[in-house]
């Protein structure tokens, strides 16, 4: 019944599919077997097709998740089954095509997440498989050094070295936060800003973190005894900055008792215990009775040196410049100084190095330096020893030194523990060196013995570039931790089981194994302490910022000028942000172009004439100058000029220097008159007040030169310092920008300075706020439309306009108004006084909702960008839900992109099951887009569309193929489809391989193929009885609809036989050698053999005539005929023509011994009465010496041919063997004995009895007539369909077979010639016509299902 699952799936019949599973599910007793008994049939839900795929594999790959859910609800489903081609599980396939919903369902079925550890045939788990596919899309190769933005800690936390607040030891990696310098009321920007981590150093008692901040960028935690943490504290649980270092630190190094810090100016600061002079400070700088430096102190010995690196040992320290290296502290022979001085209190230069030092590590008894020339020098035993990089190539088969790896052993990093030295190469390989060989070596040993004894052993040799090591770290017990280029983290551990120690893994050797650390991805650096504390620096993916070319406040105010249409629209220039959290800035050239100057000042001077008959709706100030009149806004004049603010707010008439006169002051309008100043100067002044830009017409025409002096007079009078500074220059210069700052400063103090200028009152839930309708309308389309509606209802603005927004609060609306009066971006929300992230998040989305409601589009983008800064693995689900609810499309899109880049994390513990279905669908769509470029070989809609445009017939062919396959799967014959799979697990199945034949005498064959590809089928398959059969070719899903032929070994000359005569002492093994089974190759073999063995063909036709008498043929016969008997001489003659068979060769064709092989899906069981097949021919079994074995089978199989259509009646006789075998045919041994007379007589007697038994199964006349009628209809319908599809170009005469039947009554010679011509014609046309498989047979003119 397994074929019905595939049939319902191909028909997309989900109801029938589910019903079949439910009927079977109630009877399943053993869930792991995956089948049930019903009417003698088995539903094997984990059954594979010919291509080694289960229904679950196919449904997952084709994104048919309704079928996946139904399959996973079945008790017998096995989600760990791997396909036979690549070893992919269903989870592999789901991840490969981006089907996250199916992946979530599969992980839900696997609570232990065992499927995440199953590897395919390339040794890749699902995550490694995904990482390799997306290596260039999601995980690009990063350049070093890398700045991480997240720090994770795990392992032991005995001395509070992990920086976790509660002091617990986390079982899995846990996020570590740095507490920055904060005031009593920190802002949200200070609390929730993202860290930028450069380095982490850990010792047994304390840990130090280095960030990228400009100052105070060193954070410490741990045990403070001895001054090791830089301030007077016994225990510090969290990472806090160290005070006392005013410059930015670029490198840190720690030991058990002291710490070192290197600033960007080359100075070294040290603090901690100075018991052996390891701090590098002179004796007079420390107290003799208490040699402890609590706070960081600069080493004065290096004040004239530019230090580029340093390292701290247990009781000493080293530092180096670009030319020399210096050491100080306790001298045990590791300082590189030949003098036997016990303590070196101040830095001392080490001599003898031929190349500058670029890296160094310290242990208790040795100092190892990496030189610029890639040499490794060790200071130990008061000597300098060079360690040649001699790799032990015999320790692993993976380590080979090929000619193309000239830079393979370039050292990138050194790492040392007490007894081990690890070397990380530029290629990403890790090697180990045993330090005991170096430390126990006598200083008088010869150099030659040193070179031969030192060997580096490989620890990590990768098989793909994405597994190259990026960073490594040691612990005291030699536990190695490393991270790779694909962002995964691995830890080397001692094997716990003996069987594991003897096993071999791609990434482990000897007693150690590498385990992947869960819940860690995108790791760029690892650190470890001697006590077993581990740190992982993670560089999380940062989505692209949300920015738009927004309108600056200057642009909005410039639009109020009447001649704004004459100014060209400048294309903004994108300035990249200063840091990764910043937003790109759109800048533009503020100076007016020469063309604009000509448009404004030439002819009738449009800058003046444009003010005629122009009045802005919110203008409340009128300026008269001569005959010209200018309209302006009181709030802008007050914000730009403190002098005008005093005049306009004093509410009385006044004059200044006989130039400016205040004539009228009311709440709604004011009038200003300017004397002795040309109107053009006033126009230029207003342009500056509104745009911060100075127009210089005097550079265009000299007649405008007096304007410069008048403009300078107004600038000094109105207290405009920035404008007055640039006017004296002869060259055109623009004043400093001050418009935005002036307006924001006035808004922050508007209740004191300019409350009277407010013309809008906003009624809120807990109070009211005043604002300017001008700015509200410039920022929001909502307020612009509202004020326009109010102006249509009332012709004057004498009273303040009231806006009712009672559902909003004053706190939230104040933030909105702050945006209205400024150009602040994400800084707008950094001043929120929220100490809790969830409260801050709620406030942010409330503002986002207000911006969306009131159409503050720019504020909406800024709020989304501010929220995007705090997107991480923990906040992603919340941000996705809220952004979708508040219509934050840009933020939601970035969340989806972030989820795709961290999909491994969310899949690892099936965290995607917590997502909403809509989110899961969107993430899957985005992931599919990212995967589309990486898996171009898979079918996609784009590729399919291009193929259909080029060849439209492909769709018809595909539909035809699926139709034929469905028809076939619903037939009873299809139950044998799966036995012919090329991926069958057991040896007796029809898989092309080299095998030996099991004979009746009990000889067991030997096989060189022991792999089991389908364990379930191997367990359920019963042993085969002793019968010889030939491999048949079947048609399966995915193959093209062409003629599928089952070629007997007679057609290719092959045979397998056995001689068991009375005088035979040993059985003879028949051997056949064939190529791999292929339907196309078998066609070639058939054509070849028919053309090269003419005599055999005639004998074949002669035997066919004899067989026709015992076979019911619908086209020309309605009764049974007795078989033609052969004499003993004829049989001996045929036997003598056979070529001897080799006893030792092993055949290359699969043979089943026992009952008839019904694995051919196109064959029909012949023992059933009335069984009908749509084939065009009858498959023949062996005769001659193989007839004995074939007779025991008692049945035959049907093969398709195009010449005739027949019905199998179970006759054991079939085509004769070819008398002239092909070069591939089997042969009998030359000394084989002929059959005896008694055997021949027994054979003939059995043939007669067999024919009598078969003659009893005669069909009635009614059944024969029905089959003839249906056959005629089927031939006509098949020819018509073939002609429509263009497969058959010429119409065939359907009555040919009938005429051939009548021609059989002609003389024997004529009959033989016609048969020869017809067989050759049928062979030539054998490859052109497809096979049409009928769904039904006729009964009284109607169709019925095939049984």
Curated annotation (Swiss-Prot):
Residue ranges crossing the lipid bilayer per the database entry: none
ANK repeats: 51-81, 86-115
Keyword field contains Signal: no
GO molecular function: ubiquitin-like ligase-substrate adaptor activity
Taxonomic source organism: Schizosaccharomyces pombe (strain 972 / ATCC 24843) (Fission yeast)
GO biological process terms held by the UniProt record: protein ubiquitination
Stretches for region Disordered: 1006-1029, 1104-1139, 1193-1237, 1286-1347
Extent of Polar residues compositional bias: 1208-1237, 1297-1306
Compositionally biased region (Basic residues): 1336-1347
Subunit composition and interactions: Interacts with cul3.
Classification via InterPro entries: Ankyrin_rpt, Ankyrin_rpt-contain_sf, BTB/POZ_dom, RCC1/BLIP-II, Reg_chr_condens, Signaling_Regulatory_Domain, SKP1/BTB/POZ_sf
Start and stop residues of the RCC1 repeats: 148-198, 215-264, 265-322, 324-372
Protein name: BTB/POZ domain-containing protein 1
Pfam families: Ank_2, BTB, RCC1
Composition bias type Basic and acidic residues, residue spans: 1013-1023
Pathway the protein contributes to: Protein modification; protein ubiquitination
Ranges for domain BTB: 619-698, 758-829
Job of this protein: Probable substrate-specific adapter of an E3 ubiquitin-protein ligase complex which mediates the ubiquitination and subsequent proteasomal degradation of target proteins.
Top-level taxon in the UniProt lineage: Eukaryota
Gene Ontology, cellular component aspect: ubiquitin ligase complex
PROSITE patterns the UniProt entry points to: ANK_REP_REGION, ANK_REPEAT, BTB, RCC1_3
Keyword field: ANK repeat, Repeat, Ubl conjugation pathway
């Amino acid at each position: 019944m397994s074929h019905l699952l595939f049939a319902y799936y191909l028909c997309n019949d989900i109801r029938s599919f589910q019903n079949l599973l439910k009927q079977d599910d109630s009877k399943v007793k053993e869930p792991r077997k995956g089948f049930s008994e019903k009417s003698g049939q088995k539903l094997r839900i984990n059954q594979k097709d010919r291509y080694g795929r289960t229904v679950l594999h196919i449904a997952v790959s084709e994104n048919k998740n309704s079928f996946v859910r139904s399959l996973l609800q079945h008790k017998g489903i096995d989600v760990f089954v791997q396909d036979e081609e690549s070893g992919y599980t269903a989870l592999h396939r789901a991840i490969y095509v981006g089907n996250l919903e199916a992946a979530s369902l599969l992980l839900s079925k696997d609570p232990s997440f065992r499927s995440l550890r199953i590897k395919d045939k390339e040794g890749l788990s699902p995550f490694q498989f995904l990482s390799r596919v997306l290596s260039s899309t999601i995980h690009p190769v990063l350049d070093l050094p890398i700045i991480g933005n997240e720090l994770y800690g795990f392992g032991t936390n005995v001395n509070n070295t992990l920086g976790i607040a509660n002091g617990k030891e986390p079982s899995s990696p846990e996020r570590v936060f740095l507490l920055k310098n904060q005031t009593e009321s920190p802002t949200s920007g200070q609390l929730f800003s993202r860290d930028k981590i450069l380095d982490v150093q850990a010792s047994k008692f304390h840990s130090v973190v280095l960030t990228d901040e400009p100052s105070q960028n060193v954070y410490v935690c741990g045990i403070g005894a001895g001054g090791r943490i830089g301030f007077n504290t016994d225990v510090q649980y969290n990472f806090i900055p160290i005070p006392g270092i005013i410059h930015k630190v670029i490198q840190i190094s720690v030991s058990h008792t002291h710490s070192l810090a290197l600033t960007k100016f080359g100075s070294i600061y040290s603090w901690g215990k100075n018991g052996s002079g390891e701090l590098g400070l002179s004796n007079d700088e420390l107290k003799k009775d208490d040699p402890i430096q609590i706070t960081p102190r600069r080493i004065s010995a290096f004040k004239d040196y530019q230090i580029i690196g340093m390292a701290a040992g247990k009781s000493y320290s080293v530092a180096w410049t670009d030319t020399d290296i210096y050491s100080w502290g306790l001298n045990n022979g590791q300082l590189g100084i030949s003098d036997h001085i016990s303590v070196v209190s101040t830095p001392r230069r080490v001599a003898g190095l031929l190349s500058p030092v670029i890296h160094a590590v310290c242990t208790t008894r040795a100092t190892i330096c990496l030189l610029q020339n890639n040499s490794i020098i060790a200071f130990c035993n008061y000597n300098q020893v060079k360690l040649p990089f001699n790799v032990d190539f015999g320790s692993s088969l993976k380590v080979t030194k090929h000619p193309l790896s000239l830079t393979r052993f370039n050292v990138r990093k050194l790492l040392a523990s007490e007894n081990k030295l690890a070397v990380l190469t530029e290629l990403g390989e890790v090697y180990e060196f045993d330090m005991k060989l170096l430390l126990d070596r006598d200083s008088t040993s010869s150099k030659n013995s040193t070179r031969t004894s030192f060997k580096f052993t490989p620890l990590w040799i990768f098989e793909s570039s994405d597994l190259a090591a990026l960073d490594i770290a040691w612990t005291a017990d030699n536990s190695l931790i490393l991270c790779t280029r694909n962002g995964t983290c691995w830890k080397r551990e001692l094997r716990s089981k003996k069987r594991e120690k003897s096993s071999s893994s791609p990434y482990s050797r000897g007693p150690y194994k590498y385990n992947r650390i869960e819940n860690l991805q995108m790791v760029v650096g690892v650190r470890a302490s001697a006590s077993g504390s581990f740190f992982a620096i993670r560089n999380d993916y940062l989505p692209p910022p949300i920015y738009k070319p927004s309108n600056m406040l200057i642009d909005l105010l410039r639009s109020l000028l009447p001649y704004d249409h004459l100014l060209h629209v400048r294309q903004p220039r994108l300035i990249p942000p200063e840091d990764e959290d910043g937003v790109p800035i759109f800048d533009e050239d503020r100076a007016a172009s020469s063309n604009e100057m000509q448009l404004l000042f030439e002819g009738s001077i449009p800058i003046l004439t444009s003010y005629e008959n122009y009045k802005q709706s919110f203008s409340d100030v009128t300026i008269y100058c001569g005959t010209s009149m200018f309209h302006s806004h009181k709030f802008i004049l007050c914000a730009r000029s403190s002098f005008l603010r005093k005049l306009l707010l004093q509410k009385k008439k006044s004059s200044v220097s006989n130039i400016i006169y205040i004539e009228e002051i009311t709440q709604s309008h004011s009038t200003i008159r300017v004397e002795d100043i040309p109107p053009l100067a006033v126009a230029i002044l207003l342009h500056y007040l509104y745009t911060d830009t100075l127009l210089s017409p005097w550079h265009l025409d000299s007649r405008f030169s007096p304007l410069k002096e008048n403009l300078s007079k107004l600038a000094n009078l109105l207290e405009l310092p920035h404008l007055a500074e640039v006017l004296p220059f002869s060259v055109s210069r623009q004043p400093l920008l001050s418009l935005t700052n002036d307006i924001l400063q006035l808004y922050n103090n508007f209740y004191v300075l300019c409350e009277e200028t407010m013309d809008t009152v906003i009624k809120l839930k807990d109070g009211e706020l005043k604002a300017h309708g001008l700015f509200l309308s410039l920022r929001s389309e909502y307020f612009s439309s509202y004020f326009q509606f109010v102006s249509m209802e009332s012709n004057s603005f004498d009273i303040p306009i009231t806006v009712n927004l009672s559902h909003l609060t004053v706190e939230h609306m104040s933030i909105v108004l702050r945006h209205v009066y400024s150009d602040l971006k994400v800084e707008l929300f950094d001043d929120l006084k929220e100490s809790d992230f969830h409260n801050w998040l709620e406030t942010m989305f409330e503002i986002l909702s207000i911006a969306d409601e009131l159409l503050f589009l720019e504020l909406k983008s800024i709020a989304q960008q501010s929220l995007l800064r705090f997107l991480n693995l923990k906040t992603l689900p919340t941000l996705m839900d809220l952004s979708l609810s508040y219509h934050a499309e840009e933020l939601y899109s970035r969340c989806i992109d972030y989820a795709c880049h961290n999909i491994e994390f969310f899949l690892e513990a099936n965290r995607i099951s917590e997502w909403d279905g809509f989110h899961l669908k969107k993430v899957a769509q985005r992931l599919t887009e990212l995967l589309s470029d990486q898996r171009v070989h898979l079918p996609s809609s784009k590729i399919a569309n291009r193929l259909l445009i080029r060849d439209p017939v492909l769709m018809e062919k595909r539909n035809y193929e699926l139709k034929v396959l469905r028809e076939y799967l619903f037939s009873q014959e299809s139950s044998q489809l799966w036995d012919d799979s090329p991926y069958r697990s057991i040896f007796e199945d029809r898989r092309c391989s080299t095998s030996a034949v099991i004979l009746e005498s009990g000889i067991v064959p030997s096989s060189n193929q022991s792999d089991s590809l389908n364990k379930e089928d191997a367990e359920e398959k019963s042993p085969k009885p002793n019968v010889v059969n030939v491999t048949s070719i079947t048609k399966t899903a995915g193959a093209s609809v062409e003629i599928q032929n089952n070629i007997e070994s007679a057609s290719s000359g092959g045979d397998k036989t056995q001689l068991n005569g009375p005088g035979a002492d040993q059985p003879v093994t028949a051997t056949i050698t064939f190529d791999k089974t292929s339907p196309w190759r078998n066609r070639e073999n058939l054509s070849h053999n028919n053309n090269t063995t003419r005599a055999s063909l005639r004998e074949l036709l002669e035997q066919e005539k004899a067989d026709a008498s015992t076979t019911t043929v619908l086209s020309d016969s309605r009764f049974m005929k007795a078989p033609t008997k052969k004499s003993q001489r004829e049989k001996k003659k045929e036997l003598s023509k056979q070529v001897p068979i080799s006893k030792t060769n092993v055949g290359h064709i699969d043979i089943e011994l026992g009952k008839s092989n019904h694995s051919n899906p196109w064959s029909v069981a012949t023992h059933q009465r009335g069984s009908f097949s749509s084939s065009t021919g009858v498959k023949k079994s062996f005769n001659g010496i193989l007839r004995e074995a074939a007779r025991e089978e008692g049945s035959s199989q049907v093969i398709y041919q195009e010449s005739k259509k027949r019905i199998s009646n179970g006759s054991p006789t079939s085509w004769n063997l070819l008398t002239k075998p092909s070069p591939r045919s089997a042969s009998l041994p030359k000394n084989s004995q002929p059959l005896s007379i008694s055997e021949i007589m027994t054979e003939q007697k059995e043939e007669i009895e067999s024919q009598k038994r078969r003659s009893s199964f005669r069909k009635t006349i009614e059944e024969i007539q029905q089959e003839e009628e249906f056959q005629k209809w089927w031939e006509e319908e098949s020819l018509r369909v073939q002609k429509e599809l263009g497969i058959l170009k010429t119409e065939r005469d359907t009555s040919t077979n009938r005429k051939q039947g009548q021609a059989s009554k002609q003389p024997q010679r004529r009959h033989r010639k016609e048969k020869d011509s017809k067989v050759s014609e049928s062979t030539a046309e054998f490859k052109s016509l497809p096979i049409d498989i009928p769904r039904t047979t006729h009964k009284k003119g109607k169709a019925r299902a095939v049984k």
